[in-house]
């Protein structure tokens, strides 16, 4: 059987090299979309990891919530969120928290499942300090005003065409190759008049 060992090794190597990539990929959402499409949006500190039943294939982070922006009704009688669950493997969209600073606050947007906050690679999770003043204002109050009747519509190729008067064309990805462009950091898609939504500045208006 020995002469066949090198051949078997070559076949296995070839299968490994040519196997399709299973990495999780997704485009980060506009922060307004993240708030509108999430059940829970909070500010929190990641303070540690907790033991989870390994058969669940989940990773659990212990957090300390410092502020809730959305989710009071979804939590029901619960007054706090202490844990965040995510798939254990990055290949299946598991979120890996890399910061070792336990005092650093993060904006975390996710959904509830079986009473636990769930996030993944595609979720909006960002250091609070990295958000612009306009984005902080948006999460605190303004983004919610556009959730019911307005939609941030991503432009992924030319020509970009709006499908509705309630859509705002988001071109940051296409023009800059980044989700952190001007529209993301400074604008919200809000009602201008009934049936019409436009990009509006999140800067405070002067009296």
UniProtKB/Swiss-Prot annotation:
Glycan-linked positions: 53, 77, 101
Tissue expr: Ubiquitously expressed. Highest expression in kidney and ovary.
One GO term describing the cellular component: extracellular space
Cystine connections: 24-93, 26-122, 36-147, 150-197, 155-160, 168-189
Site (Involved in metalloproteinase-binding) residue list: 37
Main location: secreted
Transmembrane residue ranges: none
Matching SMART domains: NTR (SM00206)
Signal peptide feature range: 1-23
Modified residues (Phosphoserine): 178
One Pfam family, short name: TIMP
Record localization: Secreted
Region (Involved in metalloproteinase-binding), start-end ranges: 24-27, 90-91
Keyword vocabulary terms for this entry: Disulfide bond, Glycoprotein, Growth factor, Metal-binding, Metalloenzyme inhibitor, Metalloprotease inhibitor, Phosphoprotein, Protease inhibitor, Secreted, Signal, Zinc
Family statement: Belongs to the protease inhibitor I35 (TIMP) family.
Protein name: Metalloproteinase inhibitor 1
UniProt source species: Canis lupus familiaris
Phylogenetic placement of the source organism: Eukaryota, Metazoa, Chordata, Craniata, Vertebrata
């Amino acid at each position: 059987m020995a002469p066949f060992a090198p051949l078997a090794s070559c076949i296995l190597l070839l299968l490994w090299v040519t196997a399709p990539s299973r990495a999780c990929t997704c485009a980060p959402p506009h922060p307004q979309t993240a708030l509108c499409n999430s059940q829970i949006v909070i500010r929190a500190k990641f303070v540690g990891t907790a033991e989870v039943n390994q058969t669940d294939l989940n990773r659990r982070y212990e957090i300390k919530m410092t502020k809730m922006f959305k989710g009071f009704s979804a939590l029901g009688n619960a007054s706090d969120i202490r844990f965040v669950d995510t798939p254990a493997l990055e290949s299946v969209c598991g979120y890996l928290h890399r910061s070792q600073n336990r005092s650093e606050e993060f904006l975390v947007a996710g959904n509830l499942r079986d009473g636990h906050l769930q996030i993944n690679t595609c979720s909006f999770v960002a250091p609070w300090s990295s958000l612009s003043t306009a984005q902080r204002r948006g999460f605190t109050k303004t983004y919610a005003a556009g959730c019911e009747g307005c939609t941030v519509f991503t432009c992924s190729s030319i020509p970009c065409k709006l499908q509705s008067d309630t859509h705002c064309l988001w071109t940051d990805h296409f023009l800059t190759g980044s989700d952190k462009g001007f529209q993301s950091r400074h604008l919200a898609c809000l009602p201008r008049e009934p049936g019409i939504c436009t990009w509006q500045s999140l800067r405070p208006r002067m009296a």
